[in-house]
Amino acid sequence: MKASPHRAAPCGAQPPGSSMNAIPPFAHLCEPAASLEDGHGRTVRYIRLSVTDRCNLRCTYCRSGMETFIPHESVLRYEEMEQLVDMAMDMGVEKVRLTGGEPFARKGFADFLERLRAAHPALDIRVTTNGTLIGPHIQTLKAIGLNAVNLSLDTFDRDKFEQITGRDLFGKVRENMDALLDAGIPFKLNAVAMRGFNDDELPAFIDYAMHHPIDVRFIEFMPMGEGTRWSDSCFWSAPDILDAVKGLVAVAPVEQEQRNGGPARLYTLSGP
């Protein structure tokens, strides 16, 4: 096995889904500030937009079967999101990640991406998805030059996939992963690491990263709100994940200047 530039990030944090309430046209609210800053005075170059709270999966650590959703009339329209992105770019934002729920579960999402790219050719546009519904849109994503996809996949085992998501769609996800690779669209696998569930699959994730031009991010299992099924017996800490990876393959930390500014610690993998 040749040395690989592909990376694992054992300590990314999994942000809870969120949605934004509808508001009046942004142009009437205020004059945009010169730049965006967070509470620590750092300049914000990257924003996340949740386009929907709906999802076609029922992951045990996420919704746990809950069926209460934000009313359609309270969710931002695509036109409002376009205005929001316009304003954010005026304040120095360079990257937008579109999330859900499952963004492709919302009607017209691919058309929205096309309009966003047409309006902002230089904007770094990324999508986070569960990989089940993206297939019919991959050629469109390639045509508009989508910068990258984050694809959530916790297991390479079909039965485990159905156990955790409530849906027998593992084959569809693998098919769409292959289609993304064929289209040349960069993607990263997000895997929630859980003791007693997928810790035995660490070699499979490493092997996939070593043989494909993708990154893998291992995410700590954490409570995601009321009604989710969380147990501390399943918790697998970032240091322990990293130690397990080191037991399988050589790793080297990515230099600070190569990082994307996020909280994850990045490592390159290499092996025989």
Located regions from the model:
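Radical SAM enzyme [4Fe-4S]-AdoMet core and its adjacent flexible, acidic
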Residues: C30, D159, D168-R174, D178-P272
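Conserved alpha-helical substructure of the radical SAM core
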Residues: N21-D124
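Short glycine-enriched, charge-decorated loop/helix-capping segments at active-site entrances
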Residues: E67-V75, E162-D168, W230-S233
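Serine residues within intrinsically disordered or low-complexity segments
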Residues: S4, S18-S19
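Radical SAM/AdoMet-radical enzyme domain recognition
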Residues: Y78-L98, A105-D215
